[in-house]
A protein has these predicted regions:
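Conserved core of the PLP fold type I
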Residues: 31-171
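N-terminal "arm"/small-domain region of PLP-dependent enzymes with the aminotransferase-like
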Residues: 1-38
Length: 172
Protein backbone atom coordinates (compact mmCIF):
# COMPACT_ATOMS: atom_id res chain seq x y z
CA UNK A 1 0.00 0.00 0.00
CA UNK A 2 1.75 3.13 -1.22
CA UNK A 3 -1.28 5.43 -1.27
CA UNK A 4 -0.21 7.49 1.73
CA UNK A 5 3.23 8.31 0.36
CA UNK A 6 4.93 5.41 2.11
CA UNK A 7 5.05 1.74 1.18
CA UNK A 8 3.89 -0.67 3.87
CA UNK A 9 4.12 -4.45 3.85
CA UNK A 10 1.23 -6.79 4.69
CA UNK A 11 2.00 -6.44 8.41
CA UNK A 12 1.92 -2.63 8.23
CA UNK A 13 5.69 -2.19 8.53
CA UNK A 14 7.44 0.50 6.50
CA UNK A 15 9.30 -0.76 3.44
CA UNK A 16 12.37 1.14 2.33
CA UNK A 17 13.74 0.38 -1.13
CA UNK A 18 17.32 -0.86 -0.57
CA UNK A 19 18.82 1.52 -3.15
CA UNK A 20 17.11 4.51 -1.51
CA UNK A 21 18.28 3.44 1.93
CA UNK A 22 21.85 2.98 0.67
CA UNK A 23 21.94 6.47 -0.88
CA UNK A 24 20.40 8.09 2.23
CA UNK A 25 22.90 6.39 4.53
CA UNK A 26 25.78 7.52 2.30
CA UNK A 27 24.90 11.22 2.56
CA UNK A 28 26.98 13.43 4.84
CA UNK A 29 25.04 14.51 7.94
CA UNK A 30 24.92 18.14 6.82
CA UNK A 31 23.17 17.09 3.58
CA UNK A 32 20.91 14.52 5.22
CA UNK A 33 19.61 16.71 8.05
CA UNK A 34 19.89 20.27 6.73
CA UNK A 35 16.81 22.26 5.74
CA UNK A 36 16.54 23.32 2.14
CA UNK A 37 15.72 26.98 1.47
CA UNK A 38 12.03 27.80 2.07
CA UNK A 39 11.45 28.29 -1.65
CA UNK A 40 13.35 25.08 -2.50
CA UNK A 41 16.76 24.41 -3.99
CA UNK A 42 17.07 26.39 -7.24
CA UNK A 43 18.73 23.50 -9.11
CA UNK A 44 15.96 21.14 -7.97
CA UNK A 45 13.18 23.54 -9.01
CA UNK A 46 14.75 23.97 -12.44
CA UNK A 47 15.12 20.18 -12.81
CA UNK A 48 11.44 19.71 -11.90
CA UNK A 49 10.39 22.06 -14.70
CA UNK A 50 12.74 20.43 -17.19
CA UNK A 51 11.66 16.89 -16.33
CA UNK A 52 7.97 17.78 -16.25
CA UNK A 53 7.78 19.64 -19.55
CA UNK A 54 10.96 18.66 -21.44
CA UNK A 55 10.58 20.22 -24.91
CA UNK A 56 6.89 21.06 -24.36
CA UNK A 57 7.10 24.05 -22.02
CA UNK A 58 4.01 26.23 -22.37
CA UNK A 59 4.27 29.83 -23.51
CA UNK A 60 3.54 31.75 -20.35
CA UNK A 61 4.52 32.03 -16.72
CA UNK A 62 5.90 28.76 -15.39
CA UNK A 63 7.34 28.13 -11.96
CA UNK A 64 7.98 25.10 -9.78
CA UNK A 65 7.06 25.30 -6.09
CA UNK A 66 8.57 23.30 -3.25
CA UNK A 67 6.05 21.80 -0.82
CA UNK A 68 6.06 19.40 2.08
CA UNK A 69 4.99 16.49 -0.13
CA UNK A 70 2.18 16.03 -2.61
CA UNK A 71 -0.56 16.01 0.01
CA UNK A 72 0.77 19.28 1.41
CA UNK A 73 0.70 20.78 -2.08
CA UNK A 74 -2.92 19.74 -2.59
CA UNK A 75 -3.85 21.01 0.89
CA UNK A 76 -2.28 24.40 0.20
CA UNK A 77 -3.95 24.58 -3.21
CA UNK A 78 -7.40 23.90 -1.75
CA UNK A 79 -6.92 26.53 0.97
CA UNK A 80 -5.47 29.17 -1.33
CA UNK A 81 -7.45 28.74 -4.54
CA UNK A 82 -10.99 28.09 -3.32
CA UNK A 83 -13.37 29.72 -0.88
CA UNK A 84 -14.93 28.26 2.27
CA UNK A 85 -18.22 26.63 1.27
CA UNK A 86 -17.23 26.26 -2.38
CA UNK A 87 -17.00 23.00 -4.28
CA UNK A 88 -13.77 21.55 -5.61
CA UNK A 89 -14.05 19.32 -8.68
CA UNK A 90 -12.30 16.06 -9.48
CA UNK A 91 -13.22 12.83 -11.24
CA UNK A 92 -15.33 10.06 -9.70
CA UNK A 93 -12.19 7.92 -9.52
CA UNK A 94 -10.09 9.80 -6.96
CA UNK A 95 -7.68 9.46 -4.08
CA UNK A 96 -9.83 9.41 -0.92
CA UNK A 97 -7.62 11.98 0.78
CA UNK A 98 -9.02 14.68 -1.56
CA UNK A 99 -12.34 14.44 0.28
CA UNK A 100 -10.67 14.66 3.70
CA UNK A 101 -8.66 17.72 2.63
CA UNK A 102 -11.77 19.44 1.28
CA UNK A 103 -13.85 18.70 4.38
CA UNK A 104 -11.06 19.90 6.68
CA UNK A 105 -10.92 23.16 4.69
CA UNK A 106 -14.69 23.70 4.72
CA UNK A 107 -15.09 22.85 1.04
CA UNK A 108 -17.17 20.18 -0.73
CA UNK A 109 -15.72 17.65 -3.15
CA UNK A 110 -17.80 17.21 -6.31
CA UNK A 111 -17.09 14.67 -9.03
CA UNK A 112 -17.67 14.11 -12.72
CA UNK A 113 -17.55 10.76 -14.52
CA UNK A 114 -13.95 10.17 -15.61
CA UNK A 115 -14.81 7.69 -18.37
CA UNK A 116 -17.62 7.58 -20.89
CA UNK A 117 -19.33 4.37 -22.07
CA UNK A 118 -16.39 3.70 -24.45
CA UNK A 119 -13.83 4.13 -21.64
CA UNK A 120 -12.60 7.43 -23.10
CA UNK A 121 -12.17 10.65 -21.15
CA UNK A 122 -15.67 11.95 -20.46
CA UNK A 123 -15.41 15.57 -21.57
CA UNK A 124 -19.21 15.88 -21.61
CA UNK A 125 -19.50 14.99 -17.92
CA UNK A 126 -16.59 17.30 -17.12
CA UNK A 127 -18.16 20.17 -19.06
CA UNK A 128 -21.59 19.69 -17.48
CA UNK A 129 -20.18 19.66 -13.96
CA UNK A 130 -17.97 22.71 -14.56
CA UNK A 131 -20.95 24.64 -15.94
CA UNK A 132 -23.21 23.58 -13.05
CA UNK A 133 -20.70 24.51 -10.34
CA UNK A 134 -19.75 27.84 -11.91
CA UNK A 135 -23.41 28.80 -12.04
CA UNK A 136 -23.32 28.78 -8.21
CA UNK A 137 -19.81 30.00 -7.35
CA UNK A 138 -17.38 32.60 -8.72
CA UNK A 139 -14.41 30.33 -9.38
CA UNK A 140 -13.65 26.63 -9.44
CA UNK A 141 -10.63 24.62 -8.36
CA UNK A 142 -10.31 21.48 -10.49
CA UNK A 143 -8.03 18.61 -9.48
CA UNK A 144 -6.97 16.61 -12.55
CA UNK A 145 -4.65 13.78 -11.61
CA UNK A 146 -2.63 13.08 -14.76
CA UNK A 147 -0.37 11.58 -15.97
CA UNK A 148 -0.76 8.15 -14.42
CA UNK A 149 -4.04 8.91 -12.62
CA UNK A 150 -4.27 7.38 -9.15
CA UNK A 151 -5.97 4.87 -8.93
CA UNK A 152 -6.64 4.09 -12.63
CA UNK A 153 -3.28 4.78 -14.26
CA UNK A 154 -5.06 6.76 -16.99
CA UNK A 155 -3.35 9.75 -18.61
CA UNK A 156 -5.12 12.49 -20.53
CA UNK A 157 -4.11 12.68 -24.19
CA UNK A 158 -3.14 15.98 -25.81
CA UNK A 159 -6.60 16.00 -27.43
CA UNK A 160 -8.24 15.50 -24.01
CA UNK A 161 -6.17 18.38 -22.61
CA UNK A 162 -7.19 20.64 -25.48
CA UNK A 163 -10.86 19.95 -24.72
CA UNK A 164 -10.38 20.54 -20.98
CA UNK A 165 -8.60 23.82 -21.68
CA UNK A 166 -11.37 24.91 -24.05
CA UNK A 167 -13.93 24.40 -21.27
CA UNK A 168 -11.79 26.37 -18.82
CA UNK A 169 -11.20 29.20 -21.31
CA UNK A 170 -14.97 29.56 -21.76
CA UNK A 171 -15.16 30.58 -18.09
CA UNK A 172 -11.97 32.66 -17.89
Amino acid sequence: NGTIGAIMDDEGKLICIPTVEKVLRSLPTNELAAYAPIIGLPAYLEAVKNLTFADNKPDGYLEAVATAGGTGAIHNTIWNYSEIGDSVLTSDWYWGTYNVLCQEAGRKLETYELFDENMNYNIESFTDKVNTLLADQDSLLIIINTPAHNPTGYSLSEEDWDKVLDVCKEHA
